Amino acid sequence: MSEGTPNSTHFGYKTVESDQKADMVAGVFHSVAAKYDIMNDVMSFGIHRMWKRFTIESAGARPGMKVLDLAGGTGDLTAKFSHIVGDKGQVTLADINDSMLKVGREKLRDKGIVGNVNYVQANAEALPFPDNHFDIITIAFGLRNVTDKDAAIRSMLRVLKPGGKLLVLEFSKPKHDVMRKVYDLYSFKVMPKMGALITQDAESYEYLAESIRMHPDQETLKGMMVDAGFEQVEYTNMTDGIVALHKGYKF
């Protein structure tokens, strides 16, 4: 999917200046942060938990590892990784949006998840971490909101250790026509109404639906990861391709 001209990009279906998108996306997530977890459960009928569980299982994390949960938001994956890597490991929850980080930090601390988790406000396109630092990086439902996806993927490659794994969990393209039609109807007619009802913000959920449609499809994203330098790149479709999990290694 085209990212626009060199100085422009997509914000949903709109074309905007590249340097404006980050602030516009930030506005969306500042607006929805407090109700983000509730909306995830309502909009996906709870299925997002199954998608995330599969991602955790596919990551193959072990005690003592360093994990980066990028665009980690309210910390669903961080919570699971924290238990897996244990006291000798470390999980970094990074997000560009301070409102999402605040919600995630408070939620995990309320659950008693402290000690091996740290929180960093970071832009995926220029990660503030040393080279060859993490064993595993996950980015769940975040890549589509990044202005320069290619730069972000290269940045993730840089901070992975040799032998490390990147997992990208993201909305993608349904494989069958019937599912595509149902999904479009749900995304553009139902989601904004639920957003208005629960968060009093239909516009943000209109953007989220549009951003999903503008995101690269399964094969395009696979090619982007290969072009960045990842090896053994593959993906698994879930729920008929509504969501796909891409995996790639750094060697």
Curated annotation (Swiss-Prot):
Pathway: Quinol/quinone metabolism; menaquinone biosynthesis; menaquinol from 1,4-dihydroxy-2-naphthoate: step 2/2; Cofactor biosynthesis; ubiquinone biosynthesis. It is an enzyme of class 2 (transferase). The keyword Transferase applies. CDD domains: AdoMet_MTases. Keywords: Menaquinone biosynthesis, Methyltransferase, S-adenosyl-L-methionine, Transferase, Ubiquinone biosynthesis. The keyword Acetylation does not apply. It holds the Pfam family Ubie_methyltran. InterPro entries: SAM-dependent_MTases_sf (IPR029063), UbiE/COQ5_MeTrFase (IPR004033), UbiE/COQ5_MeTrFase_CS (IPR023576). It catalyses: a 2-demethylmenaquinol + S-adenosyl-L-methionine = a menaquinol + S-adenosyl-L-homocysteine + H(+); a 2-methoxy-6-(all-trans-polyprenyl)benzene-1,4-diol + S-adenosyl-L-methionine = a 5-methoxy-2-methyl-3-(all-trans-polyprenyl)benzene-1,4-diol + S-adenosyl-L-homocysteine + H(+). Belongs to the class I-like SAM-binding methyltransferase superfamily. MenG/UbiE family. NCBIfam families: MenG_MenH_UbiE, PRK00216.1-1, PRK00216.1-3, PRK00216.1-5. Methyltransferase required for the conversion of demethylmenaquinol (DMKH2) to menaquinol (MKH2) and the conversion of 2-polyprenyl-6-methoxy-1,4-benzoquinol (DDMQH2) to 2-polyprenyl-3-methyl-6-methoxy-1,4-benzoquinol (DMQH2). This is Ubiquinone/menaquinone biosynthesis C-methyltransferase UbiE. The lineage of its organism: Bacteria, Pseudomonadati, Pseudomonadota, Gammaproteobacteria, Alteromonadales. The gene is ubiE.
